[in-house]
């Protein structure tokens, strides 16, 4: 078995060889052409010493060249590792060491931004430059020109095929290992949303994210759709332009992008009225955003919940049921259970930690045996997310179990404060963290990023908390920041906010 062969092998091409697989700027790549580029990419890797099971890192923009190289690594039996283009050099070096990468394929624009690291990898014979040429380093396109097509490597369903490096809010990125078996299970959300072969989809999420990789590349290929690929992180103008030009049947994005689009004048959002399905994942989808989007474009925002560890989604909002108050229901083939602190199923309506059994889930974390044993048990994965299941069988996300705080003897979920602050038009985004006060007690601090004037956002957030929250849930401190600090994968770095306030408080002592 080989995951790339499942998507682009003879059986798949017999049905759709001439159909367009990828659209990127002016380039249109058919399924047959993409399959040929994948075979050639695999041949180039094998010709330059990459062996089955070895890691190939790819630091490239989202282009057909990247898609062919990533799938080519899988085709060759290597392990494809797409890297976040916003990685710090320290995290890049960590992944290089952690993965023991045999080769790094780097687009020239990223190589030029890291001259020292590029020179080191060139001396070690572990780099090829994609895109344009870079003097003194091997050219990926020259390798492709000289390579022969390679046959797919029969790797077995449980053999490693790709890894996702997911950074938490603290610590270094960790490698999440997925097998060739995962390719059999992509596209579950597409089926739930009744997307049909030949339709066009557009995902704004980058291909190095699990969400973007499945819904922007692998699932469209598995189901015979055309995917619109944007090379760079798309801003609102680009998203609107691509929707107008390509008229996708479905848009896959994140709540932050939908919120930014809503800041545009309403006439500019007209292209979205032709889109049939709007999907959001990666962060919480609020009832307010669901309603605002419905009012603006007449479309229903549907929620997806999944993790890098499951790769594919686990929970989805069924069409015509979205109001933003419920996450959704499990996709076919996915098993879910809730557990309290003692490992027992909580009563209906009570929160519990979500455990997942998904046919596409990871085998574990690279070089982290203890964490693998802790979170992967007997075929189940512990998400560490809190959920409630209602009487109708819908799951409702309650936040992270490791973010639940006890304040004045009562449990508080920081998300509650963040949601209240986000109701205010002056607040662009908010994050709540615990901070120890002068009496040694843990209290809540709320940080807000303003849409306009910071003091207006501060006043609005504080007033909303005073008005809508019981006393024990109100923040002791409310502070404004230019933007919430985030990791390269977009997660809020709460510890940096806590340190910011701790420094302020220490100066006042």
Predicted segments with their positions:
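AMP-binding/adenylate-forming catalytic core of the ANL superfamily
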Residues: 87, 104-106, 358, 363-364, ...
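Conserved structural elements of the adenylate-forming
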Residues: 35-41, 162, 176-197, 204, ...
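ANL superfamily adenylate-forming
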Residues: 103, 109-157
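Conserved AMP-binding/adenylation subdomain of ANL enzymes
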Residues: 184-203, 208-250, 264
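Conserved AMP-binding/adenylate-forming core of the ANL superfamily
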Residues: 18-63, 67-71, 88-93, 141
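Gly/Ser/Thr-rich phosphate-binding loop
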Residues: 248-253, 262-323, 335
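Conserved pre-ATP/AMP-binding loop-to-beta segment of ANL
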Residues: 18, 146-165, 172, 194-200, ...
């Amino acid at each position: 078995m080989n995951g790339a062969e499942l998507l682009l092998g003879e059986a798949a091409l017999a049905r759709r060889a001439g159909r367009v697989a990828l659209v990127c700027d002016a380039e249109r790549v058919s399924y047959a052409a993409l399959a040929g580029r994948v075979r050639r990419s695999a041949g180039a890797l094998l010709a330059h010493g990459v062996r089955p099971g070895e890691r190939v890192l790819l630091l490239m923009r989202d282009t057909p060249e990247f898609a062919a190289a990533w799938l080519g690594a899988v085709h060759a039996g290597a392990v494809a590792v797409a890297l976040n283009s916003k990685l710090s050099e320290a995290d890049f070096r960590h992944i290089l060491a952690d993965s023991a990468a045999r080769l790094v394929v780097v687009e020239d624009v990223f190589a030029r931004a890291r001259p020292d690291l590029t020179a080191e990898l060139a001396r070690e014979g572990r780099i090829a430059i994609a895109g344009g040429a870079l003097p003194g380093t091997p050219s990926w396109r020259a390798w492709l020109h000289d390579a022969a097509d390679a046959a797919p490597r029969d790797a077995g369903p449980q053999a490693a095929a790709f890894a996702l490096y997911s950074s938490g809010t603290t610590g270094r990125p960790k490698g999440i290992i997925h097998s060739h078996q995962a390719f059999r299970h992509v596209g579950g959300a597409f089926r739930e949303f009744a997307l049909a072969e030949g339709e066009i989809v557009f995902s704004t999420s980058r291909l190095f994210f699990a969400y973007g990789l499945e819904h922007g590349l692998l699932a469209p290929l598995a189901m015979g759709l055309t995917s619109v690929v944007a090379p760079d992180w798309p801003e609102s103008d680009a998203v609107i332009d691509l929707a107008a030009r390509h008229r996708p049947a479905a848009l896959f994005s994140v709540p932050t992008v939908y919120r930014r689009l809503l800041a545009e004048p309403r006439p500019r959002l007209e292209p979205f009225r032709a889109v049939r399905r709007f999907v959001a994942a990666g962060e919480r989808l609020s009832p307010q955003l669901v309603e605002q989007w419905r009012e603006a474009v007449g479309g229903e925002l549907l929620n997806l919940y999944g993790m890098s560890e499951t790769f594919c989604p686990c929970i989805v909002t069924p069409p015509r049921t979205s109001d933003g108050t419920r996450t959704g229901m499990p996709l076919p083939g996915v098993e879910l259970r809730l557990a309290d602190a003692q490992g027992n199923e909580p009563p209906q309506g009570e929160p519990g930690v979500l455990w997942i059994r998904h046919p596409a889930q990871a085998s574990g974390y690279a070089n982290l045996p203890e964490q693998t044993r802790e979170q992967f048990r007997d075929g189940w994965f512990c998400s560490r997310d809190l959920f409630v299941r209602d009487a109708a069988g819908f799951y409702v996300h309650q936040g992270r179990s490791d973010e639940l705080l006890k304040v004045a003897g009562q449990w508080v979920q920081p998300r509650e404060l963040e949601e209240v602050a986000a109701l205010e038009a002056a607040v662009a985004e908010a994050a709540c963290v615990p901070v120890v006060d002068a009496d040694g007690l843990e209290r809540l601090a709320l940080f807000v990023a303003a849409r306009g004037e910071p003091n207006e956002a501060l006043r609005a957030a504080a007033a909303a908390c005073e008005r809508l929250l019981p006393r024990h849930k109100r923040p002791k401190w409310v502070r404004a920041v230019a933007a919430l600090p985030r990791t390269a994968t977009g997660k809020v770095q709460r510890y940096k906010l806590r340190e910011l306030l701790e420094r302020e408080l220490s100066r006042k002592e």
